[in-house]
């Protein structure tokens, strides 16, 4: 019987040793996985940092050179200088007569300038508003020289009326 008990104890001890060895192997694999995960995380963080630096440089460049690049792009597309600045966001207004001119392509601008239709419409609207210059009195002229001295006048005995409520 002792032989059987000894064999069972041996098998039990071998099973314990096998469990311990498999536990050690598992822990080594787990440590290797964590090391690989840390390396991947470090690589990812380095790439994120590089992307953020690149984004900051791009934002800085666009904030400095962006408006000029938009104006140049609009000029290259065929817009005149004022329209190109307006496209870039300058907020300028161009008023011809009584009309606020929209943003136009340079070819459109040339055709308007050649026909002068917009100018004639503006003059006709101004005629309706101001009338014709014929038969009007001359506009006042500016006086030259020193101004005339005037004396102050004080009204004494002013009696403001009374009210009854």
UniProtKB/Swiss-Prot annotation:
Keyword DNA-binding: no
Top-level taxon: Viruses
Pfam family, one: Calici_MSP
Region (Disordered): 128-165
Transmembrane segments: none
Predominant subcellular localization, coarse grouping: virion
Annotated function: Minor structural protein that forms a portal-like structure at a unique three-fold axis of symmetry, following binding to the host receptor. The channel formed by VP2 may allow the delivery of the viral genome through the host endosomal membrane.
Complexes and interactors: Homooligomer. The portal-like structure consists in 12 copies of VP2. Interacts with capsid protein VP1.
Note: Translated by a ribosomal termination-reinitiation process from the bicistronic mRNA coding for VP1 and VP2.
Entry remark concerning the domains of this protein: The N-terminus domain points away from the virion surface.
Protein name as catalogued: Minor capsid protein VP2
